[in-house]
Design a protein with these regions (language model features):
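Bacterial N-terminal signal peptides
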Residues: 4-17
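A bilobed periplasmic-binding-protein/Venus flytrap-type ligand-binding module shared by bacterial periplasmic
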Residues: 135-142, 178-179, 255-267, 286
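A ligand-binding cleft/hinge motif common to bilobed small-molecule-binding domains
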Residues: 86-89, 219, 224-242
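Periplasmic-binding protein-like
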Residues: 192-201, 237-263, 309
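Mature extracytoplasmic/periplasmic domains
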Residues: 262-322
Length: 348
């Protein structure tokens, strides 16, 4: 009899733990995002609205986010924000869940031109959050904008020791590949080698590689022209730096950071609620205005001040967007080729 009572007690305790674990899981979301991508107070507002607590942590690169999810397979996050080609990579590796868009009532707010991209047709695995591009920036005090209209202009010998490049293999090679008339998502090894040889010719003009903040070389007067992210360019212009954006005739390099749900997420319903919350027009507008990045949320864009939506540093016209190229997954083996050549380039 005593044994039976003990057995019932143990069963009760274990069942209680399971109930607590279930309740805890469904009232908590683990959100892993880029640094400075959510304004202060928004997650607290979500918790107040839904009762769901958000455990928030950040990363500085897609690579570090990917490595962490690969390493800690058991204790995963519920919501992440990978960039363009990492969506395709993680989807192909079975690391992402298909998203039930029927539960996203605010999905309708998104601009159709940012949906159904090659890295995730039909947006089955990703929901756009923030987008941007890499293009050419010049210090207008040093360089006449009429002299720059192409990626090829960076190779002009008169810009010796004047150019800043982003410290990213794919983006730097995309510049050379577009200059040569190839796709920035090139997988042909001969074309990649040709791009490397073209970049070797650019070495005398390169003063620095920077990815922490591509705007810093311009602030410090180190660079007169080079590659820049539009968010960095916009921030510099607000600081009064004489920076001007140039759209190369070959097209810009476009990227998008999107919501995605890891395949081993414990609170999928909570993740969907948070996505839907962040897709609200008012919330997305707040994200765009405070972070200084472009929003793919058409309803949110209508709420932004005119000086922001009319600034082509953040919102270029449709023709420019159509001319640009979105990064896509090229596979690990090809990516290793890019990285290998890139290290050789930087060691030249």
């Amino acid at each position: 009899m005593i044994f039976l009572i003990k057995l019932i007690f143990v069963f009760f305790i274990l069942n209680l733990q399971n109930i607590y674990s279930y309740a805890n899981t469904n009232n908590t979301i683990f959100f892993y995002n880029w640094t400075e991508y959510v304004p202060d107070g928004l997650l607290e507002e979500f918790t107040k609205e839904t009762g769901i607590k958000v455990i928030y942590s950040t990363y500085e690169s897609n690579e570090s986010m990917y490595a962490k999810l690969k390493t800690y397979k058991k204790d995963s996050y519920d919501l992440i924000v990978p960039s363009t080609y990492f969506i395709a990579k993680m989807k192909n590796e079975g690391m992402l869940l298909k998203i039930n868009k029927n539960k996203l009532t605010n999905f309708i707010n998104l601009d159709p031109k940012f949906l159904n991209k090659s890295f995730d047709p039909n947006n089955d695995y990703s929901i756009p959050y923030i987008w941007g591009f890499t293009t050419i920036a010049i210090n207008s005090n040093n360089i006449n904008s009429n002299n720059i209209n192409s990626w090829a202009d960076l190779w002009n010998p008169k810009y010796k020791n004047s150019i800043s490049l982003i410290d990213d293999a794919r983006e730097v090679f995309q510049v050379a590949l577009m200059k040569l008339g190839y796709s920035g998502n090139e997988t042909n090894l001969n074309h990649i080698k040709e791009a490397f040889q073209e970049l070797q010719k650019l070495i005398p003009n390169i003063i620095t590689f920077n990815s922490d903040n591509p705007g810093i070389p311009f602030i410090e007067g180190e660079a007169k022209l080079g590659m820049i992210w539009n968010g960095s360019a916009y921030a510099l212009k607000k600081l009064g730096i004489p920076l001007k954006i140039i759209w190369p005739k070959e097209g810009g390099i476009f990227w998008m950071d999107s919501f995605a749900i890891p395949s081993n997420a414990k609170n999928v319903e909570g993740a969907l609620k948070l996505i839907n919350f962040l897709l609200k027009a008012r919330i997305s507008a707040q994200v765009a205005e405070i972070t200084g990045y472009s929003t793919p949320n058409l309803a949110a864009k209508k709420l932004l001040p005119k000086n922001i939506i009319n600034d082509n540093t953040l919102y270029p016209n449709d023709q420019i967007i159509k001319k640009g190229e979105w990064q896509n997954d090229i596979g690990d083996n090809i990516n290793k080729e890019y990285e290998s050549y890139f290290q050789k380039l930087k060691n030249s």
